[in-house]
Design a protein with these regions (language model features):
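Carbohydrate-interacting/catalytic domains
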Residues: 1-46, 58-59, 63, 71, ...
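Aromatic- and acidic-residue-enriched segments that line the glycan-binding/catalytic groove
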Residues: 48-56, 92-121, 369-378, 771
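Helix C-cap/helix->beta junction micro-motif
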Residues: 80-81
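Short, glycine/charge-rich beta-strand/loop segments that flank catalytic centers
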Residues: 88-95, 835
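Conserved short loop/turn motifs at secondary-structure junctions
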Residues: 91, 328-335, 803
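Alpha-helical transmembrane segments and their helix-helix packing motifs
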Residues: 94-95, 106, 402-405, 435-436
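Active-site region of glycoside hydrolase catalytic domains
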Residues: 96-174
Length: 944
C-alpha cells in the first residue's frame, strides 16, 4: 500500500477539468505533494460544480475531459511521482433524467432491471405512493402546475416524456396507447385503413396490448425498443402521422383557463410509476431515501452486492490497474451497513489507501474494526483549531455574548430544539416511514400489538432527538461497548423525558441492544434487524441538519469553533487533550488525513485562525462591539417590528467581517458581494428569521442592505474607520496562529491534506464561496521566487517574507519547507512515535510542542500560541525579549546538535532547548536531531 506524503484536494468543475489540472502537476510536485486528492470525477449532472450528483457511475465525466484526458493527467502526474486519491459517492446518485438507471426505474417500475438499485419503498403506507416513486420537484401544487400548462407531454426519439421545465420523466410503455389512440379515427380517415403507414401504426398499437412483464425482462426491453423505433420511423417517414401525434399531444397538454382540457393529461399521469408533487411534499410523504434532505439526490441500496459491483466497476478497475492509489468514501454514515461495505471494498482493493468521511463527536472514536487508514480529518481540524482558543475565558465570552443579545442562550437547548425542528419540518416523512415500519413489526409481536402509531412515533422522535453522535454501528455482527453506552445514555434520558411512553421506549430499546426474542420466526428476526439498520441511517442526517447546518449558524458565541464535527459548547480544548488525541492517532490511525480546510468546512482555516484571537482579548472585543453597534444603528431597517439584523445576527456579522476581511484593497468590492451572498445562506441555514423552504425576503433584503450601507465607500466610512484598526490587529495575530496551525498539521500523526489554494491565505466562507477558482499562476510564480531566493539567501528571504505577510508567501514558504522535510524524514512522520514534551518557564502555556521519534532520529515541532499578550501588533514572537527563560526538555538520548528544517538554523542543546535561541528568525520551528547537520536540501539530494 502506498501511503501519501501529503494530499492536495482539487475541486474539478467544467471550467477546471483534467487539462487545467495537468498544467499544475509540476507545481504540486515542487511544493511537495505526493497525491492529488480529487473531487468526484464520474459523470454528474451537466454543469455540476461539485460532482456529488452522479448520473453514470461507469463513465469518467466528459465535462471534465472524459477518460482520454483523465488518463493523460494521470500519466503526467506519474511523471512527477504523484498518485491519485479519489473521492467516491456510494450513498446516492442524482434524481435526474440524465440518470439512465433511474429513468429505467421510472419507466418500467417493478419490471426495471434496476428496481432494487435505489432505496425506494414500493409498498408505501400512503395509497397514492404505492407502486410509484414520489417525484417532489414542482414549484407549486401539482394541480396548479397541470392547469397552468407547466407540465408538458412531449414526444422525441426516446419516446414520450412529461417535462417540467428542464426535468423530464418517462412515460411507461403501457400508457402509450392512451396517446396514440387519441382520436385515432382522424388519422385513419385521412390516410385510409389500408395505408402502409396506418397499418404500421396499428401494428404498434397491437404490440402495446401485449407488453411482457415479470420474468420476461429481456423480452420486454426488446419489445419496447422495437415499438419506439417503429414510432420514430413513422414520425420521420409520414408527415401525416407526425401531424397526428402533434395533434394528440396538444390535446393532452390542454389549454390554460380550461380545467377540463387537462383531464387526459391528469389520467395519463395517474398511470405512471412516478408521482409528481410539490417539492415540500418530499419532507412529509417521501417514499425513497435521500441524501440528508435533498430531494434530487436519491440513495442507493449499496448493501446489495449487485448494486455495489455495478456502481463500483469503473473505480475498482482504475484501482486494480494502478491508476488510482487511494479512495475517499463520502458519507459513510448513510450506508445501511458501513462495516460490510468497507469489508467488501477492501476485498476488491486490498492495497488501496482508504479513508472515510466520518464526523466524530469530541471524544468519539472511529470503529477500530474498519479496514481503513482513518478519517478525512475533521477530527484533527477541531483538535488543532481548539488549542488556539483560550479556554479560561469561556465564562467571560458567555457573558459578552449574552449581554450583546440581551438574553441568555443555552446551546444544549438549541441543539435539542433544532433537532426536533428538523424532525418535524424536514425529516417528517423519513421518521413517519420508520414509525410505520415499527408499527408493522409491533403488530406481529404479542407484547407490542396494542402500541399505537402515536406512541411509537413519540418514542422514536425522543430517541432520535437525544442521539449524541452521528450514528451507531450495531449490526448482526454485534454491538460495540461504545455503542451500548450511547444507547444506554439515550434511553435513560428518554425515559425521564417522556415517562408516559415507557412501554414504547422499552420496546424500541430491545431493537437497539439486539435483544431479539428467540421464539420469533427468522422472518420476524430479520425485520427487527432491518428496523435497527434503517434507524441508524437517519441519526446522521438529523445530526447534520439539526446541528451542523442549523445550530452552528444560531449559536454564535465564537464562530471559529462552529465547524463540521465540533461541539459548540466546547470552548477550545486543553493541550493535554490535544496530546492524548495525537498519541491515540499515532498508535491507531497513523495514516489518517490532517485537514484544516475542506470543500465542506464552514470557514477557511485562516479565517478561523483570526477569529480565535478574540478569545485572547475578550474585554477589547466587547468594547468594539458596543462601538460598532452604536455607529451602525442608523443603518438598520425594521421588519415585523424588529430591527434588522437582530443582535444575534449582528454579532455573527462582525465576527465574519473580522475573519474574512481581505488583505488587499483591490479585493474589497468583491468581498462586499461575497459577504452579502454569505449572509443569505447563513440566515437561511439558521432557520430563525428565514429559511430555504420559506424565505423571508423582507428580512433578507434588510440584512443585505445593512451590510451594503455599513461597508460602502471604504475611504469615507465611520464604521470602517473604527473597525479597521482592530481588524488589522486581529489579522496580524491570526497570521501567527495560521503559521503555527500549518506546522502542526504537517507534523502531527497523520498526513497533511491541503485544500486547493490554501497554501496561501484561505479566508473563504462556506460553500459555494470556498469553491471559487484558484489562481495557480501566482502560486507557481511565488514558489519559484521562494526557491530561487532560498537557495541564494535563506535568512534574507525569511526577513522579506515576514515584512510582507499579506501576500501569503510566508505561508507558502512554510508549507514548502515542511513538505520537503516530511519527504526526507518520511519514516519518522509515518511510523514514528509521538512524544509529548515538557515546557518550562512562565510562558509554557504559550507553546505547543511535541516530538516524533523513530530509531536515532528525533523531530520536534514548536508552535507558539496566545501571542496577543507576548508581542505587540506587527511584531513577531522572536528572540530573548519574548521568550526569556522558556525552554523545552528534549527526548532522552538526543544528541546536542539540532537543525531547524525551516530556517536552516542550528541549535545546541542536549538537556535543554531554549526558545530564545530556537525562535530567532521565524515564528515556528521544526528541529531535527541528527548526527549530520546538513540542510534539508542536502538531505533531499542524498535521498535522490
Amino acid at each position: 500500500m502506498e501511503i501519501p506524503v501529503a494530499t492536495y484536494r482539487i475541486q474539478f468543475t467544467p471550467s477546471f477539468g483534467f487539462d487545467q489540472a495537468k498544467a499544475i502537476a509540476s507545481y504540486l510536485a515542487e511544493l511537495g505533494i505526493s497525491d492529488l486528492y480529487a473531487s468526484p470525477i464520474l459523470t454528474a449532472r451537466k454543469g455540476s460544480t461539485h460532482g456529488y450528483d452522479t448520473v453514470n457511475p461507469n463513465q469518467i465525466n466528459p465535462e471534465l475531459g472524459g477518460r482520454e484526458k483523465f488518463l493523460e493527467l494521470v500519466a503526467e502526474l506519474k511523471n512527477f511521482h504523484i498518485g491519485w486519491v479519489q473521492d467516491i459517492v456510494p450513498n446516492h446518485m442524482a434524481f435526474d433524467s440524465q440518470n439512465h438507471m433511474l429513468v429505467d426505474v421510472l419507466e418500467n417500475g417493478f419490471d426495471s432491471q434496476y428496481r432494487e438499485f435505489f432505496d425506494i419503498d414500493w409498498h408505501h403506507h400512503y395509497p397514492e405512493n404505492k407502486g410509484k416513486v414520489l417525484a417532489p420537484f414542482l414549484g407549486k401544487f401539482c394541480g396548479d402546475c397541470l392547469e397552468s400548462g407547466e407540465l408538458k407531454l412531449q414526444y422525441e426519439e426516446n419516446g414520450l416524456t412529461i417535462n417540467y421545465y428542464s426535468l423530464k420523466f418517462p412515460i411507461r410503455i403501457e400508457s402509450y396507447s392512451q396517446v396514440f389512440t387519441y382520436d385515432l379515427g382522424r388519422i385513419r380517415d385521412k390516410l385510409g385503413r389500408d395505408h402502409p403507414h396506418f397499418m404500421k401504426l396499428l401494428s404498434v398499437l397491437y404490440m402495446l396490448k401485449y407488453i411482457p412483464s415479470g420474468e420476461e425482462g429481456r423480452e420486454r426491453y426488446d419489445q419496447i425498443i422495437i415499438i419506439k423505433r417503429m414510432l420514430w420511423e413513422l414520425w420521420n417517414d409520414s408527415p401525416e402521422i407526425q401531424e397526428f401525434i402533434e395533434y394528440s399531444i396538444r390535446a393532452f397538454n390542454g389549454e390554460p383557463g380550461k380545467p377540463e382540457s387537462f383531464n387526459h393529461l391528469e389520467n395519463l399521469l395517474a398511470e405512471q410509476f412516478f408521482r409528481l408533487a410539490y417539492w415540500k411534499v418530499g419532507n412529509e410523504e417521501l417514499n425513497y431515501r435521500r441524501f440528508f434532505t435533498v430531494n434530487d439526490l436519491i440513495s442507493l441500496k449499496i448493501e446489495d452486492e449487485q448494486v455495489f459491483h455495478t456502481t463500483h466497476a469503473c473505480m475498482l478497475k482504475l484501482v486494480q490497474e494502478g491508476t488510482i492509489s487511494g479512495l475517499r468514501i463520502d458519507h459513510i454514515d448513510g450506508l445501511y451497513d458501513p462495516a460490510q461495505y468497507l469489508t467488501r471494498l477492501r476485498e476488491h482493493a486490498p492495497e488501496v489507501y482508504l479513508v472515510v468521511e466520518k464526523i466524530l463527536e469530541p471524544h468519539e472514536e472511529l470503529p477500530i474494526n474498519w479496514s481503513i487508514q482513518g478519517t478525512t480529518g475533521y477530527d484533527f481540524l477541531n483538535q488543532v483549531n481548539g488549542i488556539f482558543c483560550q479556554q479560561c475565558v469561556a465564562p467571560e465570552f458567555d457573558t459578552i455574548y449574552q449581554r450583546f443579545l440581551g438574553r441568555k442562550v443555552c446551546c444544549e437547548e438549541l441543539i435539542d430544539q433544532n433537532k426536533r425542528l428538523i424532525i418535524s419540518r424536514h425529516l417528517a416523512g423519513d421518521i413517519d416511514n420508520l414509525a410505520h415500519l415499527l408499527k408493522q413489526i409491533s403488530g406481529r409481536y404479542r407484547y407490542a400489538s396494542d402500541f399505537t402509531m402515536y406512541g411509537l412515533k413519540a418514542a422514536l422522535v425522543e430517541i432520535l432527538a437525544l442521539f449524541p453522535v452521528y450514528r451507531t454501528y450495531i449490526s448482526s455482527a454485534g454491538t460495540s461497548k461504545a455503542d451500548r453506552e450511547y444507547i444506554k445514555q439515550v434511553m435513560t434520558q428518554a425515559k425521564k423525558n417522556i415517562p408516559n411512553f415507557l412501554n414504547e421506549l422499552n420496546f424500541i430499546e430491545k431493537f437497539l441492544i439486539l435483544d431479539i426474542d428467540e421464539h420469533l420466526s427468522p422472518e420476524d428476526q430479520e425485520q427487527w434487524l432491518h428496523f435497527l439498520m434503517r434507524l441508524q441511517q437517519f441519526t446522521g442526517p438529523l445530526m447534520a441538519k439539526g446541528v451542523e447546518d442549523t445550530v452552528l449558524y444560531v449559536y454564535n458565541r465564537l464562530i471559529s469553533l462552529n465547524e463540521v464535527g465540533s461541539h459548540p459548547t466546547h470552548f477550545g480544548i486543553s493541550l493535554e487533550d490535544f496530546h492524548t488525541f495525537n498519541q491515540q492517532r499515532a498508535s491507531q490511525w497513523p495514516h489518517a488525513m490532517n485537514a484544516t480546510s475542506t470543500h465542506d468546512t464552514k470557514r477557511g482555516e485562516d479565517m478561523r485562525a483570526r477569529i480565535n484571537v478574540l478569545s485572547e482579548i475578550p474585554q477589547e472585543w466587547e468594547i468594539h462591539l458596543k462601538e460598532w453597534r452604536e455607529i451602525n444603528a442608523p443603518y438598520k431597517e425594521t421588519v415585523n417590528r424588529q430591527d434588522v439584523p437582530t443582535p444575534n445576527d449582528e454579532y455573527f456579522f462582525y465576527q465574519s467581517l473580522i475573519g474574512a476581511f481581505p488583505f488587499k484593497d483591490d479585493e474589497y468590492p468583491g468581498f462586499v458581494e461575497r459577504i452579502q451572498e454569505y449572509i443569505i445562506k447563513a440566515i437561511r441555514e439558521a432557520k430563525v428569521h428565514t429559511e430555504w423552504i420559506k424565505p423571508d425576503t423582507a428580512y433578507e433584503n434588510a440584512f443585505t442592505n445593512f451590510a451594503d450601507r455599513v461597508l460602502k465607500d471604504p475611504h469615507n466610512n465611520p464604521f470602517l474607520e473604527a473597525f479597521r484598526p482592530f481588524q488589522r490587529k486581529i489579522q496580524h495575530y491570526g497570521i501567527l496562529n495560521s503559521l503555527s496551525q500549518t506546522l502542526l498539521k504537517a507534523t502531527a500523526p497523520g498526513l497533511p491534506d491541503f485544500y486547493q489554494g490554501s497554501e496561501l491565505w484561505d479566508l473563504s466562507l462556506v460553500d459555494p464561496d470556498n469553491r471559487r477558482p484558484v489562481d495557480f499562476e501566482i502560486r507557481q510564480k511565488y514558489l519559484q521566487d521562494i526557491k530561487t531566493k532560498a537557495a541564494q539567501d535563506l535568512s534574507g528571504l525569511i526577513a522579506e517574507l515576514l515584512q510582507t505577510p499579506e501576500d501569503g508567501r510566508v505561508k507558502l514558504f512554510l508549507t514548502y519547507q515542511l513538505l520537503q522535510a516530511r519527504r526526507v524524514y518520511l519514516d519518522v512522520f509515518q511510523r514514528g512515535t509521538y512524544v509529548k514534551l515538557s515546557v518550562a518557564g512562565s510562558l509554557k502555556s504559550h507553546v505547543v510542542t511535541f516530538a516524533r521519534e523513530l530509531a536515532d532520529t528525533r523531530i520536534i515541532a514548536i508552535a507558539p500560541r496566545f501571542l496577543t499578550s507576548l508581542v505587540k501588533e506587527g511584531e513577531y514572537p522572536l528572540g530573548e525579549q519574548v521568550w526569556h527563560e522558556t525552554r523545552i526538555v528534549p527526548p532522552a538520548g538526543s544528541s546536542d546538535v539540532w537543525y531547524d528544517a525551516i530556517t536552516g538554523h542550528k541549535v545546541q542543546g542536549e538537556d535543554t532547548l531554549w526558545l530564545r535561541e530556537i525562535l530567532q528568525q521565524f515564528p515556528v520551528a521544526l528541529l531535527v536531531n541528527h548526527v549530520e547537520t546538513s540542510t534539508t536540501e542536502d538531505k533531499n539530494q542524498e535521498a535522490e
